[in-house]
Amino acid sequence: MAQFFKAKPNSSKQLSAKQSFSVQQLDHLGAGIAQHQGKVVFIPGALPNETVQAQLTEQKKNYARAKLIKVETPSTERVSPLCPHYHTCGGCDLQHMSLTAQREHKSAALVDIMAKFAGAEGSLAPALSGEGWHYRRRARLATLFDKNTKQLSLGFRASSSSHVVSITECLVLAKPLSDLIAPFAKLLNQLAAKSSLGHLELIAADNGHFAVIRITKSLNDKDMAKLAQFAEQHQIHICLQDNEGEFHGVNGTLLLPVYQLLDDKTDVQPVSLTFTPGNFVQVNAQINKAMVAQALDWLAPQPGERILDLFCGMGNFSLPLARMGADVIGVEGVPEMVSQARENAVANGLSNLTFYHGDLSADLSSEPWMGKIDKLLLDPARAGAYESLQWLKKMKPRQVVYVSCNPASLARDSAVLLERGYKLQKLGLIDMFPQTHHIEAMALFELAK
């Protein structure tokens, strides 16, 4: 029998068709989840209990993705985004959801991920939460020079794109810094070297406001004078970062930003953290203080106890732990941050604190700090602390506090702790980035008796 050609369904038509979807829940990235022809469909911008009109943009074997076109039946938790740049800027992705609902979703997602991938269940601590707007004390804005218009754009990159979205304000950035965006855009466009400028970093510290401008070639005297005048007019410290990574104050002196780590309400002597622009620091001052206070409460450091702080950075947790009287060892993989941490220990008058540089993904058996400890604090990057946890038997801490910026790696590493005889005692959300899907958490593990 002759076999005739049978045309395949036109996939482009399938992808371009607008369809109605009923959204059941959110995934951990904040996208709405619906079902369509036996597949899970992810729809960014959609909320649970909504009926939406969306357009399929990607078809895979077991799932699909769609672009939200219209909300037909809105959720009671849907709110109007406050930011005029929300739908183009890639910075925030949950402004369409009430702040209360955001936090409920994040807490539920955290518990779900821990239960599903680690089989871990512990007492859920109250979420660490604060202001929903103007909470960022630091931001890096991208620049883009248009060779045709000879204009420099200042803003954030669009989601999953290198395109720079020009902005005039940022509602999650500290108000004094947000108010500087438009004036800075005007200033930078007046410079002769505007085609040679990189990013602009804005910092609100406890000792003033700072701006760091990345340059690819030296600025002439007129440009330097304009920057110095702007700095004086707006009461901001401006420094330039050259191709070698060195920083130079526009007025000839370089002042470093300083943050306070302990809440003013504590009875403990203050602890300050001095850092160089470019070093990693937590961007939410209110939540960082609450996070440090909670870590101190959960670990309850005592004089004479040996506490190890892995991935310690410049001492965000190490310094307060030492202030409480414990003998603290901090280990960090970035040499410059170790040097800054040591300087911070001296500046705070702490002699019961030692910092080491080390690769925490390598063999740690011969490290001078490796050995029996009383308690362990982990604050790794998104990749987690899996390799470091392989040395638990040698360290034998009674308690482990794990601070995580990625619930997936936290769940994976929690499974290691459970296998080593630890029990999850407490788990809590850290809402470091309101208006975004990002989930941070703190977990307390104790060695079973």
UniProtKB/Swiss-Prot annotation:
The entry sums up its family as follows:
Belongs to the class I-like SAM-binding methyltransferase superfamily. RNA M5U methyltransferase family. RlmD subfamily.
Its UniProt entry gives the catalysed reaction(s) as: uridine(1939) in 23S rRNA + S-adenosyl-L-methionine = 5-methyluridine(1939) in 23S rRNA + S-adenosyl-L-homocysteine + H(+)
Task: Name the gene behind this protein.
Answer: rlmD
Function per UniProt: Catalyzes the formation of 5-methyl-uridine at position 1939 (m5U1939) in 23S rRNA.
* PANTHER family listed in its UniProt record: 23S RRNA (URACIL(1939)-C(5))-METHYLTRANSFERASE RLMD (PTHR11061:SF49), RNA M5U METHYLTRANSFERASE (PTHR11061)
Q: What class of enzyme is it?
A: transferase
Q: Quick check: keyword S-adenosyl-L-methionine in the entry?
A: yes
> Record's InterPro entries?
23S_rRNA_MeTrfase_RlmD, MeTrfase_TrmA_AS, MeTrfase_TrmA_CS, NA-bd_OB-fold, SAM-dependent_MTases_sf, TRAM_dom, U5_MeTrfase_fam
Query: What EC number is given for this enzyme?
Result: 2.1.1.190
What keywords sit in the KW lines? Answer: 4Fe-4S, Iron, Iron-sulfur, Metal-binding, Methyltransferase, rRNA processing, S-adenosyl-L-methionine, Transferase
Q: Which residues cross the membrane?
A: none
Q: Where does [4Fe-4S] cluster bind?
A: 83, 89, 92, 170
Question: Record's Pfam families?
Answer: TRAM, tRNA_U5-meth_tr
Q: Which PROSITE patterns match?
A: SAM_MT_RNA_M5U, TRAM, TRMA_1, TRMA_2
> Taking every annotated instance into account, which residue ranges of this chain make up the domain TRAM?
12-70
Alphabetically, the GO molecular function entries are: 4 iron, 4 sulfur cluster binding; iron ion binding; RNA binding; rRNA (uridine-C5-)-methyltransferase activity
Q: What is this protein called?
A: 23S rRNA (uracil(1939)-C(5))-methyltransferase RlmD
Q: What are the GO BP annotations of this UniProt entry?
A: rRNA base methylation
Please name the catalytic residues of this protein: 405 (nucleophile)
